[in-house]
UniProtKB/Swiss-Prot annotation:
This is Skeletal aspartic acid-rich protein 2. It comes from the Eukaryota. Residues 1-16 form the signal peptide. Keywords: Membrane, Signal, Transmembrane, Transmembrane helix. It comes from Acropora millepora. Residues 390 are cytoplasmic. Residues 58-99, 254-271 have a biased composition (Basic and acidic residues). Residues 17-368 are extracellular. Residues 100-121, 272-292 have a biased composition (Acidic residues). The keyword Transmembrane applies.
Length: 390
């Protein structure tokens, strides 16, 4: 007996749909041609450029056009971010699905996820993951092993809902927040992920730079870190903590190399200098000076990463990192960026961003094409069986 064609087709459709679902503690955000997948375990972020299609374009237009909301979401780590439009409706059958009126036929978690976009063997894949936090003294030596986080591999982050109609510095973005509490250190770590849907200019302290549609920014925030004070009995070495080293593991097509080409820098960095002065010093009260330009790294495949030279401390006080930071380290073929954060009392904010380049052309079969091919093969087999028995 032959299996009915309807059953075979239904089975294949079920397989395709199952591959599109996220796990409970992952979120996928998707723009016109860039997707980012965020993992609650370790806070890992995977970024790829994907092929555009008609449905994705419509979905992105829906997100960009929804700009009526101006309510400040004070629960967010970033008070500059605006919440989703109040017209959005929640699917009662799938509470995690936050849908807008124009998006009622999306997949279960409203993330347009295609799991085959994110493969570890994809050479064009970019990934970023917190590696460790380490308190160091003025000489860069570790203060106390209790004042460190050796690995984030087993750290669980809580993920917010995906906000498809957010704004950052006046630009349309899709965003999701991660947060966790470090029990041993009694500190909080948050990651705010933004996928830009339109190009524009962003300022971070003294640094101004351009973003594109498809740029992904992920602010990393550390709150309430208790630094050693030298005489504190809680610190066994009695050293004084002066900096907090934040290390981030990365995966990229090529080993990151700093961009020195002036033309490429001009495409990224803006300045506010309207006069032809020779003043290269950025004075706080001198609006005629150039803004600093972030460090630009080429990641291979035309992908670029921007690393700010400073951090925001406490009440949005821009503070430069020590000379030589942020810096690239390579250990046993593992690539890492190290950010040396000056001592703070409340919070510290690091602000890296990345723009993925074009994907390397390769032969790939989508789930829809795979289904059509299997259906065609099944029909041909059925016809062949009919001829054999007749």
């Amino acid at each position: 007996h032959c299996l009915p064609l309807e059953s075979i087709a239904l089975f294949l459709v079920c397989l395709a749909d199952e591959e599109r679902k996220d796990d409970d503690n992952t979120k996928t955000i998707r723009g016109k041609n860039v997707s980012a997948k965020i993992f609650g375990r370790s806070g890992k972020i995977m970024i790829v450029r994907v092929d555009d299609d008609e449905d994705d374009t419509k979905d992105t237009v829906d997100r960009v056009s929804d700009k009526k909301d101006n309510v400040d979401d004070r629960r967010d780590n970033d008070d500059r971010e605006e919440s989703i439009d109040k017209k959005d409706t929640v699917d009662k059958k799938n509470p995690i699905d936050d849908k807008d009126d124009k998006d009622d036929k999306d997949d279960v978690d409203n993330d347009n996820d295609k799991d085959d976009d994110f493969r570890d063997d994809d050479e064009d894949l970019l990934s970023f993951e917190l590696d460790e936090l380490k308190e160091v003294d003025a000489d860069g030596d570790e203060v106390d092993d209790k004042h460190s986080v050796d690995s984030f591999d087993d750290v669980e982050f809580q993920l917010s809902h995906v906000r498809t109609a957010s704004r950052f510095k006046g630009l349309a973005v899709i965003s999701v927040n991660l947060s966790t509490h470090l029990q041993n250190n009694k500190a909080n770590v948050g990651i705010m992920v933004y996928l830009f849907l339109e190009p524009g200019s962003v300022t971070f302290g003294n640094e101004t730079f351009n973003v594109k549609a498809g740029t992904v920014k992920f602010n990393i925030e550390v709150n309430n870190w208790d630094f050693c004070e030298g005489s504190s009995p809680a610190c066994s070495s009695r050293k004084e903590g002066k900096f907090l080293d934040l290390t981030m593991k990365i995966k990229s097509k090529d080993s990151p190399t700093e961009v020195e080409d002036d033309d490429r820098k001009k495409a990224v960095c803006n300045d506010k200098d309207d006069d032809n002065d020779d003043d290269d010093v950025d004075d706080d009260d001198d609006d005629d000076d150039d803004d600093d330009c972030p460090i630009i790294y080429s990641m291979g495949g035309d992908s670029e990463m921007l690393l700010n030279r400073g951090v925001m401390l406490d009440d949005d006080e821009y503070t430069a990192m020590p000379v030589g930071f942020p810096k690239l380290e390579i250990e046993d073929e593992t690539r890492k960026f190290v950010f040396r954060i000056p001592k703070f009392s409340k919070r510290a904010l690091v602000d890296p961003s990345v723009t993925p380049g074009e994907r390397t052309p390769k032969l790939a079969i989508s789930a829809g094409t795979w289904l059509q091919l299997n259906f065609l093969v099944t029909v041909l087999v059925q016809i062949a069986v009919m001829f054999v028995f007749h």
